[in-house]
């Protein structure tokens, strides 16, 4: 992940490291920052942002600032989709891959056990190139699911 993050920084992107799991993610973020600083202590690190996140509202605020979200967390994927954000999902569990597939975004889901920086870069570039269309599709899918949920609520309330 350090090589991918450095690639993003070197190509002019701002990288926000935001926790969606409040116990383990801060440890990962700290380790990632240390690794990046060790590899490249002066390389565009002013665009590497790691603001503390301790509430749902702060998570949503951080995700809202992103144009593309790269996450391995299920809730990071869900919240990003709800915000209409394109997601590069690093899948550690089938539920992440399944959600990406359900949203028509399975081509932007990578298995964490076979993860390589080059594959992340390639998928990120594809997502960046198509992010307008991808965002539109995600918003349409979210609207479709909201409508289905409203129908389910109406049916349950009539029981």
Model-derived features: positions:
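Active-site anion-handling motifs in enzyme catalytic cores
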Residues: 1-159
């Amino acid at each position: 992940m350090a090589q991918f993050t450095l690639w993003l920084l070197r190509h002019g992107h701002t990288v926000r490291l935001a926790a969606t799991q409040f116990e383990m993610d801060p440890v990962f973020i700290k380790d990632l920052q240390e690794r990046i600083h060790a590899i490249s202590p002066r390389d565009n690190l002013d665009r590497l942002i790691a603001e503390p996140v301790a509430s749902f509202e702060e998570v949503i605020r951080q995700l809202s600032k992103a144009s593309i979200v790269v996450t391995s967390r299920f809730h990071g994927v869900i919240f990003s989709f709800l915000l209409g954000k394109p997601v590069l999902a690093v899948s550690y569990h089938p539920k992440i891959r399944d959600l990406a597939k359900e949203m028509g975004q399975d081509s932007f889901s990578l298995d964490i056990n076979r993860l390589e920086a080059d594959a992340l870069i390639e998928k990120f570039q594809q997502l960046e190139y198509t992010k307008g269309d991808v965002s539109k599709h995600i918003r349409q899918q979210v609207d479709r699911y909201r409508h289905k949920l409203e129908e389910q609520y109406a049916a349950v309330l009539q029981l």
